[in-house]
UniProtKB/Swiss-Prot annotation:
Pfam families: Tubulin (PF00091), Tubulin_C (PF03953)
Keyword Metal-binding on entry: yes
The protein's name: Tubulin alpha chain
Annotated organism of origin: Xenopus tropicalis (Western clawed frog)
GO molecular function per UniProt: GTP binding; hydrolase activity; metal ion binding; structural constituent of cytoskeleton
Domain notes: The MREC motif may be critical for tubulin autoregulation.
Function comment: Tubulin is the major constituent of microtubules, a cylinder consisting of laterally associated linear protofilaments composed of alpha- and beta-tubulin heterodimers. Microtubules grow by the addition of GTP-tubulin dimers to the microtubule end, where a stabilizing cap forms. Below the cap, tubulin dimers are in GDP-bound state, owing to GTPase activity of alpha-tubulin.
Length: 449
């Protein structure tokens, strides 16, 4: 089988992990103690879920996941929570003191004490796999563990498992809801370090998710649980093709092949529809064309940026539920005619489509309604450079005054790393700019005679 190992790093990664595994269990009919009710006999029926769960001799299903945090409180909640029996206790790894929102602590001083036990555990999980496909790494950009430890881990995973794909789900620091002043520093340091190690990174902007919760679900003051449940639906849509059989199945490497035109430009924009509360869904029937249209609304994106100002390089539509290719083709044709979607001229306007017949699952007591069909769109657009520009600007404001830098230097970093990381980000912005430039402009000279 094509197994995937999930690694959840830091508070954000662990809490996203809780939401995701809760949803996976519901989708596959696995109980919180890891048992699958007896009607699904071992080896009978659909075994695609083994990409994410391993099965013990006793018929218990254990997630192929590792939870890591440099301080124990968040993972202690998992150890005492509803799903405490689901995870192998050794897959929940905690340190003693936290990274204090400091990239240098997560990457150098404290991270290096815990990296070996973590890699050991990952090695054991990898040994149980018959054909390991890759890693899904969940973390935030802003925290110390999420930024520092993740970048350390990605470097080591590249050494140990060179050819395996590594996909990230990263929480991008939100302008309004900031948990730390130094988020821009951490974000830029971690992006610079992991840029060459990550194959594909799905960014999730907290503010964008907040707005979706407020606007579409009528939650006045969304909590992290609300945000994570929405994020888990998106992660589930992206990974559904690995866990279920469908008409058009997509695997991890296929995403990269279709979404990443150049190795550095690997930050697809995710959009999910329909996000709708239970009382609204009761009164509306959402057709394939409606949810497909909703994907092109900037309001439904996971990162705040405006694709109408950018150009698309690639576009993947992942449908699940009651969807037939005929409807999809009609919906896409309609969008091509009426939407002003600009593709870069070196990329023909292809939409890659995946369809999974498993309808989306709603978490009992959650905010999202149970719907018949849903779609997740992954598009690689030059507009996401706006997000980097925002972050770089904040970095510059602080770094011009060398504010807070002594905390990083005190943990053994050199100031040169800051400027090096910032230059790399400037190069990334430039890359995005160049990708969007039409290719025929620079060829004109050669064609005069």
């Amino acid at each position: 089988m094509r197994e995937c190992i999930s690694v959840h790093v830091g508070q954000a990664g662990v809490q996203m992990g809780n939401a995701c595994w809760e949803l996976y269990c519901l989708e596959h009919g696995i109980q919180p103690d890891g048992q699958m009710p007896s009607d699904k006999t071992i080896g009978g029926g659909d075994d695609s879920f083994t990409t994410f769960f391993s099965e013990t001799g006793a018929g218990k299903h254990v997630p192929r996941a590792v939870f890591v945090d440099l301080e124990p409180t968040v993972i202690d909640e998992v150890r005492a929570g509803t799903y405490r029996q689901l995870f192998h206790p050794e897959q929940l790894i905690t340190g003693k003191e936290d990274a204090a929102n400091n990239y240098a602590r997560g990457h150098y001083t404290i991270g290096k004490e815990i990296i070996d036990p973590v890699l050991d555990r990952i090695r054991k999980l990898a040994d149980q796999c018959t054909g390991l496909q890759g890693f899904l790494v969940f973390h935030s950009f802003g925290g110390g563990t999420g930024s520092g430890f993740t970048s350390l881990l990605m470097e080591r995973l590249s050494v140990d498992y060179g050819k395996k794909s590594k996909l990230e789900f990263s929480i991008y620091p939100a302008p309004q809801v900031s948990t730390a002043v130094v988020e821009p520093y951490n974000s830029i340091l971690t992006t610079h370090t992991t840029l060459e190690h990550s194959d594909c990174a799905f960014m999730v902007d907290n503010e964008a998710i907040y707005d979706i919760c407020r606007r579409n679900l009528d939650i006045e003051r969304p909590t992290y649980t609300n945000l994570n449940r929405l994020i888990s639906q998106i992660v589930s849509s992206i990974t559904a093709s690995l866990r279920f059989d469908g008409a058009l199945n997509v695997d991890l490497t296929e995403f990269q092949t279709n979404l990443v035109p150049y190795p550095r430009i690997h930050f697809p924009l995710a959009t999910y529809a329909p996000v709708i509360s239970a009382e609204k869904a009761y009164h509306e029937q959402l057709s394939v064309s409606e949810i497909t249209n909703a994907c092109f609304e900037p309001a439904n994106q996971m990162v705040k940026c405006d694709p109408r100002h950018g150009k698309y390089m690639a576009c993947c539509l992942l449908y699940r539920g009651d969807v037939v290719p005929k409807d999809v083709n009609a919906a896409i044709a309609a969008i091509k005619t009426k939407r002003t979607i600009q593709f870069v001229d070196w990329c023909p306007t292809g939409f890659k489509v995946g369809i999974n017949y498993q309808p989306p699952t709603a978490v009992p007591g959650g905010d999202l309604a149970k719907v018949q069909r849903a779609v997740c769109m992954l598009s690689n657009t030059t507009a996401i450079a706006e997000a980097w520009a925002r972050l770089d600007h904040k970095f510059d404001l602080m770094y011009a005054k060398r504010a807070f830098v002594h905390w990083y230097v005190g943990e053994g970093m050199e100031e040169g790393e800051f400027s090096e990381a910032r230059e790399d980000m400037a190069a990334l912005e430039k890359d995005y700019e160049e990708v969007g430039i039409d290719s025929y402009e620079d060829e004109d000279e050669g064609e005069e005679y």
